[in-house]
Amino acid sequence: MPRYIRAHIPGGTFFFTVALLERKRRLLIEHIDALRKAFASVQAQRPFTIDAAVILPDHLHCIWTLPEGDADFSARWHAIKSRFSRSLPNQERLSTRRSAKGERGIWQRRFWEHAIRDDEDLARHMDYIHYNPVKHGHARSVADWPYSTFHRLVKRGVYAPDWGAGDNVRAMELA
């Protein structure tokens, strides 16, 4: 198996996709408070800024900025996944391999990350994040989805309250 090399950019800004192992489950929104608590706990121990985020039933997307001199997002994701998993009852199916390693069968082992290159790249990824609930059919409009940073960013003037409605959305595919 090829060894994946992660980006190492101290103080960098990154887009992430993290998914449940069983993509038909709805654990992330059914246990949203536990997920928020896991994020807050890790953020208190190993600070990072959440620039944008959306939580869907079976996966999440977010953009983080790490502190100056710090490039270790992997340890943060490991801790978030671990804390969230420990908060849930043991009800998932486990493979022999995961069981032997003492793992839970909740998360996919890996995650996708992309180093944000510039302001345009950041804007494109923020739009992608916030439009994702509509794309996946979980909401009719961006403003209808409660599990994202969209509402916070509307208050800050980054987005108009009706952003994502009708024709005011540019192409949402990421290159």
PLM segments and residue spans:
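Short catalytic/metal-binding and nucleic-acid-binding patches
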Residues: 1-175
